[in-house]
Amino acid sequence: MTNYPQLNKEIQDNEIKVAMHTNKGDMTFKLFPDIAPKTVENFVTHAKNGYYDGITFHRVINDFMIQGGDPTATGMGGESIYGGSFEDEFSLEAFNLYGALSMANAGPNTNGSQFFVVQMKEVPESMVNQLVDGGWPEPIAKAYADNGGTPWLDQKHTVFGQLIEGEATLEDIANTKVGAQDKPVHDVVIESIDVEDK
């Protein structure tokens, strides 16, 4: 049976728990090293080294996603721990459901340090029907129907984690006032990211 780790909030032995502290509250995620090993290692190493500390969510689109992880706050910056961009790690077990932690990119295999959290609360019914026809697994299509998400990003952005606590913080950030290029008028800052060691 295929495992869809995003469909439950329990942290399994093969998952990593991280707490993201922002100036608008905390968000807790579980990461999937079995599904996206290089992506998770990149994120965890950056988190432990303080790379993300003080970085903002530079692009916020309510009812779509919040994006951060760029030290330049322009959407053009950031690098991976591997010294350049690295390859996508797509899976048929992880999807861009509401609350998914996913890599931002500039096309195939251009992952660096930027990530986003999916915040779209409703997938149109017509699209949900297309998902089942298009080969999306039934439990995932149901999760999209029930909770929302951005299915058109599947197999285009690496999903490597899922929000398990702090939905109110995600919503608060998403509802922040933005100016040009969807940049928040008042900085939304990632103060630190704690990685829970097993």
Swiss-Prot record:
Keywords attached to this entry: Isomerase, Rotamase
Recorded GO MF terms: peptidyl-prolyl cis-trans isomerase activity
Pfam families associated with the record: Pro_isomerase (PF00160)
Record's keyword annotation contains Repeat: no
Recorded family membership: Belongs to the cyclophilin-type PPIase family.
Gene3D superfamilies from the UniProt entry: Cyclophilin-like (2.40.100.10)
Record-given protein name: Putative peptidyl-prolyl cis-trans isomerase
Reactions catalysed, as given in the entry: [protein]-peptidylproline (omega=180) = [protein]-peptidylproline (omega=0)
Gene source species: Staphylococcus haemolyticus (strain JCSC1435)
Domain PPIase cyclophilin-type residue range list: 14-195
Function according to Swiss-Prot or TrEMBL: PPIases accelerate the folding of proteins. It catalyzes the cis-trans isomerization of proline imidic peptide bonds in oligopeptides.
InterPro entries listed in its UniProt record: Cyclophilin-like_dom_sf (IPR029000), Cyclophilin-type_PPIase (IPR024936), Cyclophilin-type_PPIase_dom (IPR002130), Cyclophilin_A-like (IPR044666)
EC number: 5.2.1.8
